[in-house]
A protein has these predicted regions:
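Acidic-basic catalytic patches of nuclease active cores, encompassing PD-(D/E)XK
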Residues: 1-29
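Phosphate/oxyanion-binding active-site loops and adjacent basic polyanion-contact surfaces
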Residues: 2-3, 37-42, 72-77
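Conserved catalytic cores of phosphodiester-cleaving nucleases, focusing on short active-site segments
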Residues: 6, 42-50, 58-67, 80
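Active-site metal-binding core of divalent-cation-utilizing nuclease and nuclease-like domains
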Residues: 22-52
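Short, solvent-exposed loop/turn segments that connect beta-strands within catalytic domains
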Residues: 52-57, 92-95
Length: 151
């Protein structure tokens, strides 16, 4: 998918900027609770761990890649964010906010899951400029980084 070819290098750059203190996963099974539909394969996941062999909590950001229409990916991204929240709870690494993004590579839309409340940023951000998108992801990965260790 063309969008994934644009999204992946952006997320790799976030990892590089943050000194490889985060991990990036793509296309892996993320079955958390099949009974409630929290199963499937995510497009991209960023975790606040330098481990790259397996997903370790806390999972912080989910990115859903779409060919064109971003709206078509919002529901799926939110479900994956809920799965990430549950994953963190099971691993006893709760963090207050899980972030999400739906992108076709040149347009990016962002979502926040705080406790049980989902907030969708109605703005759609273009790429380029890449600096703005990078700054959003860096903020997400650093937000509450210190607090998450004590929660």
């Amino acid at each position: 998918m063309r969008s994934e070819g644009i999204i992946y290098p952006v997320l790799l750059e976030v990892r590089r900027i943050l000194d490889r203190q985060i991990s990036l996963f793509s296309g892996e099974d993320f079955t958390i609770d099949e009974a409630v539909g929290l199963n499937g394969v995510f497009d991209f996941l960023l975790a606040r761990s330098s481990e790259v062999l397996e997903i370790e909590a806390p999972a912080v950001v989910i990115v859903e890649a779409k060919k064109t229409d971003l709206k078509s990916g919002l529901g799926q991204c939110i479900a994956e964010m809920v799965a990430a929240q549950r994953f963190n709870q099971v691993k006893e690494k709760n963090i207050p906010i899980i972030y999400g993004s739906v992108s076709n590579g040149i347009q990016w839309q962002f979502i926040k899951l705080e406790n049980q409340i989902v907030t969708i940023d109605l703005s759609v951000y273009p790429l380029p400029p890449v600096e703005q998108i990078l700054s959003f992801f860096i903020f997400m990965m650093q937000n509450d980084a210190i607090d998450s260790e004590t929660i």
